[in-house]
Amino acid sequence: MRRQITYELPDFRKLLNRGEEKRVNDEVLLEKARIIEETLASFSAPGKVVEVNPGPVITQFGVEPDYLLTRSGKKQRVKVGSIARLDADLALALAAKSIRIEAPVPGKSMVGIEVPNDEVALVSLLDIMEAPEFTRIDSKLRIALGLAVDGTPVAADLTAMPHLLIAGTTGSGKSVCVNAIIACLLLQNTPDDLQFIMVDPKRVELTGYNGIPHLVAPVVVDLERIVGVLQWVQREMETRYHKFAAIGARNILDYNKKIGPDQRRMPYYVVVIDELADLMMLAPDETERLLARLAQMARATGIHLIISTQRPSVDIITGLIKANFPARIAFMVASSVDSRVILDQPGAEKLLGRGDMLFQSPEAAAPVRMQGVFVSDEEIARITGFWKAQLIQKGGPDALATTNRELAFGSVDRGMELPGRRRSSRPAAQQALWEDPELTGDDGMGEDELYDQAVELVRSLKKASISLLQRQLRIGYTRAARLIDRMEEDGIIGPPQEGSKPREVIKFD
C-alpha cells in the first residue's frame, strides 16, 4: 500500500498559454451592417442594426425590426419570423459560409444575426480561468467553457449541472472540449479532492492521462469492461449513501464537514466516457439503465458524469438518457435532426466547427453560442507532467510504476473497498477492478462455478458472445464478460470480432 502523499496545486499560469487577440476591422463591420439592412429591406422586412458584438469566431449583429405601412396607413412592426426566414438570403448577400439567426435574443428587444469572421482567434483556457466570471464561482468543480458571441467569458459549475452531455461530428471540437474540462479540473484539485474514472474505447483521446495520481484506475479501453465500470460506480454511489446515513449527512459537502480530523475526506468522482455510441451498440439496455440511475441519484454523493459522442442519433442519445442530462453542449452536426436530438431544437447544424458550440445550461431557457476554450497537446502534457513529477518527487522514484500496478489490481487504499482479484494473463490496466465477487460468482481465487457449463454451451453452439451467455445462463453482464475472458485465455474462443459478431470457437476436445 502506498504511503499518503500531500499534494500541492500548480500555478496554472505557468502551465497554460495565453490566447491570441484579433480585432475585427470597424470598416468591415460597418459594411456588413449596411448589407444586412439593405438585404432585409429588399425582402420587405426592414430592420436597423442597433448593436454589434464582435467575438473570436463570429460577430453578432443586433437588428431591431422596423415598421411597415399597412394599406390603411397604420404602422405595423415587422414580424420576427419574417427576419428569421431570411438566413439563406443573408448568407448569400454577406458571402458567408453559414449564418445563424437568434430570434429574438433572450432578454433583448432585437434579433441576433451571427456572421462568421474572416479570421478566427483562439480562446485559451488561461484567459477564461483568469476572468471574474470564472473566479467568482465558489466550487471545486468549476469549469471554463469559452467566450460568448458578445465576448463575455463563460464558466459553469459541474456540481450544479450536475452531469454533462457533449455531442458533435468529427473535427467539430468535441474532444478538445473534453480535454479542456479535464485540464481545468486538474489545475484546481489535488487527488485528495478529485478522482477520475476515464473510459476511452477509441484508445487515443484519454490514454495520455495514465499515470496521474487522480485516476481511480488506468484509463479503461476494453469495451467489454465498460458496463462493469458503470456497475462499480453505482455500487460506490450506494456505499456513499450508507456512509452519509451513518453520520446524518445530506451530501458530500455535509459529510466532509462532519467527519473527524483523523478520517479521510471523501473526494469527488468525475466519470468521463469519451464515446457513448460504442457502449450503446454493445449493451444498450444495461447502459441506459445504469446511466439513468447514476444521473438521477449520484449528484449528492459527489459523482458526476461527462459523456461525449460523435453520433447524436435517437438510438444513442435516448429519451431517458437525455432527460437525465439537462446540461448539454452541441458542436457542429450534420443535420437539424441531429441538433434536435441534442438540444431539442435546430441550430447546431449551422455551427462552423473547430470549437464553435451551443451550451444548454439547466438554468437557461435557450442555448448560448460560444467559442470553446482550446487546450493544446503541449499544455496537457505539461499538466500531466506536473502531477506525475510530484508523485515521483514525494512518493519516491518507483512511485509512478507502483501507482499504475496497484491501481490496475485494485489494491490501493482510496477510502473504499475494492474487491480482491487473482492476477490473470490479461493486461494489468484492464484487470477486473470494477467487478464485485458477489455479483460474478467468483470464489476469490478466480474460479466460476458456471465456467464448465459455459464452455460446453459455446462448443455446442459453435459461437460465443457475452449476450449469448447472459441469455442462456441468465447471468449479468459482468459475470458473462469474465467467462468470455477466461475462455479466451484458455484458448477455447478467439479474439473479439468487428462490430457485434460472435466470437469463433477455435478449440475442441
For each of these PLM feature ranges, what is it?
Residues 1-155, 160-163, 190, 404-442, ...:
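Low-complexity, intrinsically disordered P/S/T-rich segments
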Residues 67, 312-313, 471-476:
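Conserved short loop/turn motifs at secondary-structure junctions
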Residues 251-254, 432-433:
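A detector of tandemly repeated sequence units and domain arrays
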Residues 258-261:
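Conserved helix/coil segment N-terminal to the catalytic DExD/H
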Residues 1-10, 58-60, 82, 89-93, ...:
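P-loop NTPase catalytic phosphate-binding loop
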Residues 43, 240, 244-247, 390, ...:
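Solvent-exposed amphipathic alpha-helical surface segments
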Residues 16-23, 74, 217, 221, ...:
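Short coil/turn segments at secondary-structure junctions
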Residues 264, 268, 280-282, 288-293, ...:
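Conserved P-loop NTPase motor module
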